[in-house]
Amino acid sequence: PGVSASYLEDKSIQRVHKALGIINVPPLKREDGTYWTKARVIQEFGFPVISKEIAGKVELLQNPSEKNKTVRHAIITGETGEYGGWQKNSKMQLNQRWLQLFGGYENENEGCDFQKPDFLVSAKCCYYLKEKNCDDWGKELNSVPYLGLMASEGGRRAKSLRMNGCNYFGASTIRSAPFAIFHRQDILKLALEMDELWKAGLKEKYHEKLLKEGRLSQSFEMPDSIIPEIYGTIEKKPDGTLYTTKAQRTGCSMCGFGIHMEKRPHRFDLLYESNPKEWDYLMFHMCKDANGNDYGWAKVLDYIGVGWDPSTIGGNCKGQMSLKDFIR
């Protein structure tokens, strides 16, 4: 069956998933028996910002221990110990932009003068909200996943596919990534072909099947297209290149990984248009500081220099990337 942590996605994606009968796997449960939520994970562990790799490094800086002392030194200086081969200028070091904003936790130890924010940073949200719960679901039902990863996406996903291939058989993990060899253009073409089938009668067949299985209510309105509204429509440029008129990529609505590289209107700007109530909550109310005051993504985006005010769309000078931001 199709399985997804759909509750993390945009509502238009959730609607399409429901129309296709995709199983929504809930998040992990906390020790008190309640489920982890976006707000609870962010409040306890920190904001997912910049990238998973960098967020993980900042989280180490924010949680110093004797055990991670050598790693923290490498994050600030690039110098590794014996385990890292005594390297200088290693890739462990944060680039200058992020060192300046997040390296202040080690000022006393390293004799530096960097800043530090008054909010937490972490990459743990993925684990608590989608990774571990989907893994547990697979083990419980003796199933292994087909993942929609593509090497063309780059980053950690491409690295994982290069290391492990399309089909991975490990000691405790088995998974297949059949889309690995395809590119974005292939997926957009497939989406158009599937949408034609949907409009040519597949929608009615799914509706009838899911009603019979008791997985849909009589009042549920099937979407006219299986291309979620958040993407807009799929159009073709003069050179034949396919593109989506709205969002280019989506994921968890509160994720900030890569936000500093997006031109405006970015993902939070689009959320403001589609769901202003959720946008307001994420921007200003999802966390509380030590004094009990609400805050959210607006504070984080201000700190890293990314615009978020809807009235300023059309320019985002503070958040523009420069060549040095890609070094290391």
Regions found by a protein language model. Name each.
Residues 184-199, 203-328:
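ATP/NTP-dependent adenylation/nucleotidyl-transfer catalytic domains that generate, transfer
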Residues 1-186, 193:
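ATP-dependent adenylation/nucleotidyltransferase module used to activate substrates
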